Amino acid sequence: MEIDLMKHIQKTKFIFVTGGVYSSLGKGVSASSIGRILVELGYSVAMQKLDPYLNIDPTYLSPLQHGEVFVTKDGKEADLDLGTYERFINADLNKYASVTSGKIYYEILTKERENGFDGKTVQTIPHVTSAVIDYIKKIKDSLKTDFIIVEIGGTIGDIESLPFIEAISQFKTIYGVNNVMFIHCSPLIYIEKVGELKTKPTQHSVKTLRSLGINLDLLLLRTNQKLDEVTIKKLAWSCGLDIDMIFAAYDVESVYLLPNVLFEQGIHKTILDFFSLPLKNDNINSWIDFTDKITTFKKHNLVIGLVGKYVELPDAYKSVLASLELAAIELNIDLKIKYIQPQNLNENNINEELKKINGIVIPSIAGSIKGWPGALLAASYARKNNIPFLAVGTGVNIGIGEFINNVLKLPIEFINLGNGDFSFLKDAFVKNEIENYRIGEYCSNIQANTITSQIYLKQNQLNERHRHHFEFNNHYINNYFLNQNWKIGAISVDNNYIDVLEYTKNHFYVLTIFNPEYTSKPSKANPYFINLLKMSLKIKES
């Protein structure tokens, strides 16, 4: 790595966000909230996640351990936090926005096996740290925004994250101290019996950061208690910060309210002053208009059933839930989600379990066959009772399988992947032999006189993100479905692939082989989720 002490002012400013004391602190939402404020003030923002785990990416991580796999526009399988980033800053990120230790080490070791280091000893410093810095530069060069906010995964003090911490310490020297800000998120522990906020864990976390070469520029405290002046002064003194560099990320009713909380404290002024940047706009009124819809009295209420293999961890369906939430906010609906484990559904309890459900969503499902009978029962209940139904991604198997089983009376067979799991139904789906894996954004032609044409008003095409190896078998669908009250809602622009199927006897029974949840944004929830709720409400109140 060449050390170029660039002390002059850089156009792109960097904010690095670390977390202390324990994981699942909410630093991703905190970082995203800062990003949203900067966007509202007229600055362009990109975000990046540096994750210390040794998986190359989250493709094969269990959803029960790590939550959903998010997919970027350019086809990167990424940490679910990227979905949070995109929704908050209202921007599409790219393949450089998600980097893991596993990816860094894999690339270094591959290069070493090819003698790419000319016989040099490969070490954490400088080779690993330089690789991290290269990825930080790549997102800057590819997205060219005013700000880049980088979240460091894990907790300060974890051995896994040390190369990342060293890398960002070096980066500040390389890029210029006036162009890089360090923010640390840390909890204040409230002892209810004595009514006291304990600051010692945060003090130790900051001390650990200092020992690793990171001097804080701003401290963001997670707490559900109002910060008092004594606590702020105590932390300022012990952490070597001015009191105006300490802010509180209070617990809020909705994560989308956190930008409001931070803006009211003036965090934007501190950040802009640090970088010597002007205050282009003195309000975040457009965001407040959106969040006012969250806190206002709801005129309507709905219950949507989410049927999925991993409902024990809702984060496994993070973007689906976010899409439903954002759609409900737009429509002024008090939305309740009923999580339904398909393995618990059977012929004896299906009516009781679903009788109060106004709509059903089946997200991507993969893995063992155990939950199939219950999932098919849910799809059958929706089809027979005209319950609005949306199956996305690999969840289209359920809508197709139910019809094959109950209407066509054909046997259900699965494509054997050789590991006890299934991916798609045999015959109804075929492996994509041309592209192998459709992942990322693809364009589809909307077909006339369909539900899709009604919800994508004045559009002839749609752009959605895919993540699948298999496609609808066009021949099978043409022979068995299109003469049985099914329509093609959208087809790929090259006419090779069916992307949307719709059952026309129901008001809203839609199967999308792409994952529409990935493109929902505040004030612009994906149309499929908007119309699922619209139709659910219409049927309920009719």
Swiss-Prot record:
Tell me the subunit arrangement: Homotetramer.
Residues folding into a coiled coil are none
Which species is this UniProt entry from?
Ureaplasma parvum serovar 3 (strain ATCC 700970)
Active-site residues annotated for this sequence: 517
Name of the top EC class for this enzyme: ligase
Tell me yes or no: is Cell wall biogenesis/degradation among this UniProt entry's keywords. Answer: no
What does the record give as its pathway? Answer: Pyrimidine metabolism; CTP biosynthesis via de novo pathway; CTP from UDP: step 2/2
> Which SUPFAM superfamilies does the UniProt record give?
Class I glutamine amidotransferase-like, P-loop containing nucleoside triphosphate hydrolases
Q: Where is the Glutamine amidotransferase type-1 domain?
A: 310-542
Function recorded in the entry? Catalyzes the ATP-dependent amination of UTP to CTP with either L-glutamine or ammonia as the source of nitrogen. Regulates intracellular CTP levels through interactions with the four ribonucleotide triphosphates.
This chain is encoded by the gene named pyrG
- Fill in the misc note: CTPSs have evolved a hybrid strategy for distinguishing between UTP and CTP. The overlapping regions of the product feedback inhibitory and substrate sites recognize a common feature in both compounds, the triphosphate moiety. To differentiate isosteric substrate and product pyrimidine rings, an additional pocket far from the expected kinase/ligase catalytic site, specifically recognizes the cytosine and ribose portions of the product inhibitor.
InterPro entries xref list: Class_I_gatase-like (IPR029062), CTP_synthase (IPR004468), CTP_synthase_N (IPR017456), GATASE (IPR017926), GATase1_CTP_Synthase (IPR033828), P-loop_NTPase (IPR027417)
Matches recorded under Pfam families: CTP_synth_N (PF06418), GATase (PF00117)
Q: Locate the residues binding UTP.
A: 23, 198-203, 234
Q: Where does Mg(2+) bind?
A: 81, 151
Which positions bind ATP?
Answer: 24-29, 81
Query: Could you name the domain of life of the organism this protein comes from?
Result: Bacteria
Q: Name one GO molecular function term.
A: ATP binding
EC number from the UniProt entry: 6.3.4.2
Name the keywords, alphabetized. Answer: ATP-binding, Glutamine amidotransferase, Ligase, Magnesium, Metal-binding, Nucleotide-binding, Pyrimidine biosynthesis
Q: Where is this region: Amidoligase domain?
A: 1-277
Identify one Gene Ontology CC term for this UniProt entry. cytosol
Q: Note the Gene3D superfamilies from the entry.
A: 3.40.50.880, P-loop containing nucleotide triphosphate hydrolases (3.40.50.300)
Catalysed reaction, written as an equation: UTP + L-glutamine + ATP + H2O = CTP + L-glutamate + ADP + phosphate + 2 H(+); L-glutamine + H2O = L-glutamate + NH4(+); UTP + NH4(+) + ATP = CTP + ADP + phosphate + 2 H(+)
Q: What is this protein called?
A: Putative CTP synthase
Q: Where does CTP bind?
A: 23, 158-160, 198-203, 234
